[in-house]
From Swiss-Prot:
It comes from the Bacteria. It comes from Bacillus cereus (strain G9842). Pathway: Carbohydrate metabolism; tricarboxylic acid cycle; oxaloacetate from (S)-malate (quinone route): step 1/1. This is Probable malate:quinone oxidoreductase. Belongs to the MQO family. One of its GO terms (biological process) is tricarboxylic acid cycle.
Amino acid sequence: MSNMQQKTDVILIGAGIMSATLGSLLKELAPEWEIKVFEKLASAGEESSNEWNNAGTGHSALCELNYTSEKSDGSIDIGKAVKVNEQFQLSRQFWAYLVKSKLIRNPQDFIMPLPHMSLVQGEKNVEFLKNRFEALSKNPLFQGMEFSDAPETLKKWLPLIMEGRTSNEPMAATKIDSGTDVNFGALTRMLFDYLKTKNVELNYKHSVENIKRTKNGLWEVKVHDMNSGKIEHHTAKFVFIGGGGGSLPLLQKTGIPESKHIGGFPVSGLFMVCKNQKVVEQHHAKVYGKAKVGAPPMSVPHLDTRYIDNKKALLFGPFAGFSPKFLKTGSNLDLIGSVKPNNVLTMLAAGVKEMGLTKYLIQQVMLSHEKRMEELREFIPNAKSEDWDIVVAGQRVQVIKDTDAGGKGTLQFGTEVVSAADGSIAALLGASPGASTAVHVMLEVLEKCFPSRMVEWEEKIKEMIPSYGISLTENPRLFQDLHTSTGRTLGLNEKETVHN
């Protein structure tokens, strides 16, 4: 089949949560469109979406302190927290639609109810958390949140963390029962199983080597079939690059103006995993702390109950590492290969600006097991070294670009869509909040790339995602109704309390 041209409507590159979500949306909105998926690895959801390669938090800003910043007057800016929460609600609604429509089954295999908690130490941090709690409590999306700085309450909420604690330093926590643990690997595999039934062509062990524009305005994707060794050429009207850290090099190959002056900085993550089941059973929450002064946002420490392979697990981290690879299964030449004449100055400017991050990563890489245990003991004073192993999580490629606010070579910490002016190709770059906001981000892809179709699609989108285009903050009754109905469908309600 070498050099044979094969035409299709849509090509999705990468079999992760983003392509799975976009493919599922398109199959509901335009069922007649032909879709092909190309994935370098042997199965779906094996890179960033894999359950061991991300924190599995349903990011809705219930406990993540980096989404609420303190202003100079001491008040709390909750804008980003509200935005992230609203975006997660879209994911929750779409997943509930898929379950209710019997397109995917057994929601407990990918989402579980789990309290989300924030925990801080020190007088100043306690005051910050109280102010945060008061600011968020006024918003309907965060109702049901509790605050306590009483040691007896904290012992009830956090028995493992409070046991053996000798310091008299003030502590406080917030707790909300409507949090979730999401197994994005399992969800990705379910979505691709569904897409297979809709005649989506899934090609595993197929590596995309090049993407170029044809004379008639289509995109030609050069694919290496790693099973047969043959080279294939596929053309499509629309291409989505959802290859995690591998998206940037592929975007650069397209040559679109929007791909210029963008760089990527890879950061690897490590987690400690508890192998003593007795310890695992003593904790039931995702508990997020506060990043240390000067540390980057991705360094927020958290102690998480996880549900992986139908078993309860306990993970602590993340610890950062450095590897020049853009994917866990990538090449050591990824970083240097991504430096181009059009982004070299952007990359160099970031290098000068981000000396603090570089120093932080070097320190993290040098940590011994015992040094990591010392950080864990700030959460679990009685933690024993022999009970904990280290696991290497996924690679995250932080976007570097020139911005008006930050100037040349500014490091970005979010998720962003880069698309051609004519909407014929789009790529997803960046890291957190990532998978949790997959539905919002893929709706953004549809809006950018298929603007002429949005009016015709709107009714179906609202059937799948009722709050699409609506602020739930401004419609508390709708939020209440949707939260209850999606919770019932996804099997979350028995542990959740959302107050009127």
